[in-house]
């Protein structure tokens, strides 16, 4: 079978809780999850698949159909989040219209939450839920060995399939993969130069993953209290060397909290130093998982920024979100990070249930006092299957399971709902714009950014983002 791994064109994605001013212009991140699946398939079968990533390549629907005509794939595999479900379904319909015999398989975070609901959609033939690397290859191998007997598919855990138009969902695969057994993502199938991010430190950006899972209990997160696993320092640094040889000099570790296992992270940093690898990189971390030893190792090995999930200045709202941290811990961690010579990005949240306008603006002031390189103020949103969503349903704040309804009946007019009883969506969006304007328009912040500009393209990119933030506040 000829396999096409596809990231569909972006045209009807659901609007997120991030402000419109910051949604565009940030660049494109590689789809590592799908690249891992492609790499496992290639290693296991010896066959080289095709990988088309439409957004960074600027590929339109018409151009995609032309490329598919040339490739003539038997199976098209896409990894989807809830935000791009509509894009995936629209693309599936377009492909099936041209090629009725083509098979469509969907995997990814949305499918993990709603496997049957996704499979029930027309034009979808298979779904993979759970860690898809091994499951997808088992699906293809089974189809190739005995395509006349679909019953053979029922033994593959983590697979959904159809028989006579009826959806069949197999048992969940509960055995987790050994991360050191994973092949490196199939970056050789894409044009690495197409991936960029405007607030990086190097010429060529790409992403990498060293861990999976997070033991923290944040109620708004979909991987809340999941098993934390990590790769060996040798495996991670071998991959970094491969990326450097491909021309990459700016990495983002997409791990939710890479700092959970401090010793393993420090060993990884030390190995980067021992091998003399010159790389710029950034990570994400909780404020209660760093110390001076970790920060020193990160700085020496090339880390230039840490993304902290801070959320709020209010102890009661941090408790409501089950963050497990306090404003004092946040201040201490940010101070240590600055002292170590590492920048940081502050992820903040407004519109938390029962939060007042005064508390939201206090969170902005708190963020300004922390002196981060950047801050983002998202509107608190109960995403599907999260503890926050269930908690808000239990409190009667959310009166209907609208995410379930969307999973069953995806529609273009669907809008994310924010749930603070004291504010309308329009009021929250306006407050969000005001928060960003208050943070980014301060004289001290502007002067700090001017002194850090590395080049004219860097200046113009940041200026465009700043202009978007300010004009959004003025309603332009």
Question: Where on the chain are the PLM-derived regions?
Answer:
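Catalytic cores of alpha/beta
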Residues: 115-120, 294, 354-369
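Short catalytic helix/loop segments, enriched in acidic residues and glycine
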Residues: 20-41
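Mobile, glycine-enriched helix-loop/loop "lid" segments at the mouths of ligand-binding/catalytic clefts
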Residues: 173-192, 388-411
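Glycine-rich beta-alpha loop elements in corrinoid/cobalamin-binding modules
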Residues: 33, 40-41, 48-178, 379-385
């Amino acid at each position: 079978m000829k396999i096409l791994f596809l990231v569909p064109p972006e045209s009807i994605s659901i609007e997120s809780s991030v402000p419109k001013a910051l949604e565009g212009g940030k660049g494109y991140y590689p789809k590592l999850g799908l690249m891992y699946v492609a790499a496992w398939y290639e290693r296991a079968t010896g066959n080289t698949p095709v990988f088309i990533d439409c957004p960074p390549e600027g590929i339109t629907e018409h151009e995609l159909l032309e490329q598919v005509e040339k490739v003539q794939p038997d199976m098209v595999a896409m990894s989807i989040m809830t935000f791009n479900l509509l894009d995936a379904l629209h693309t599936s319909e377009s492909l099936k219209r041209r090629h009725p015999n083509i098979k469509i398989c969907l995997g990814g975070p949305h499918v993990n939450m709603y496997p049957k609901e996704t499979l029930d959609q027309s034009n979808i033939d298979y779904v993979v839920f759970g860690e898809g690397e091994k499951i997808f290859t088992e699906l293809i191998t089974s189809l190739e060995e005995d395509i006349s007997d679909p019953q053979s598919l029922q033994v593959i855990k983590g697979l959904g399939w159809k028989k006579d138009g009826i959806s069949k969902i197999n048992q969940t695969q509960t055995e987790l993969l050994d991360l050191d057994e994973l092949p490196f993502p199939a970056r050789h199938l894409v044009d690495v130069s197409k991936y960029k991010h405007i607030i990086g430190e190097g010429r060529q950006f790409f992403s990498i993953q060293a861990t999976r899972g997070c033991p923290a209990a944040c109620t708004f997160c979909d991987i809340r209290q999941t098993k934390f696993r990590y790769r060996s320092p040798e495996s991670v640094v071998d991959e970094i060397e491969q990326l450097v040889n491909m021309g990459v000099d700016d990495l983002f570790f997409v791990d939710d909290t890479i700092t959970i296992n401090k010793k393993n992270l420090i060993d990884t940093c030390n190995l980067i130093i021992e091998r003399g690898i010159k790389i710029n990189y950034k990570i994400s971390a909780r404020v209660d998982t760093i110390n001076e030893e970790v920060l020193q190792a990160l700085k020496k090995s090339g880390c230039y920024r840490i993304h902290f999930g801070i959320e709020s200045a209010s102890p009661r709202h941090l408790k409501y979100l089950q963050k497990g941290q306090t404003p004092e811990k946040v201040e201490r961690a940010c101070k240590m990070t600055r002292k170590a010579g590492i920048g940081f990005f502050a992820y903040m949240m407004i519109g938390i249930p029962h939060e007042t306008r005064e508390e939201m603006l206090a969170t902005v002031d708190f963020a300004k006092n922390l002196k981060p390189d950047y801050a983002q103020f998202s509107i608190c949103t109960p995403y599907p299957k999260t503890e926050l969503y269930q908690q808000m349903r239990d409190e009667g704040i959310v009166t209907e399971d609208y995410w379930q309804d969307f999973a069953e009946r995806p529609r273009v007019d669907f809008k994310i709902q924010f749930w603070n009883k004291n504010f309308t969506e329009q009021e929250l969006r306006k407050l969000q714009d005001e928060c960003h304007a208050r943070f980014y328009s301060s004289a001290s912040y502007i002067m700090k950014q001017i002194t850090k500009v590395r080049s004219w393209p860097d200046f113009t990119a940041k200026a465009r983002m700043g202009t978007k933030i300010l004009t959004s506040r003025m309603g332009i």
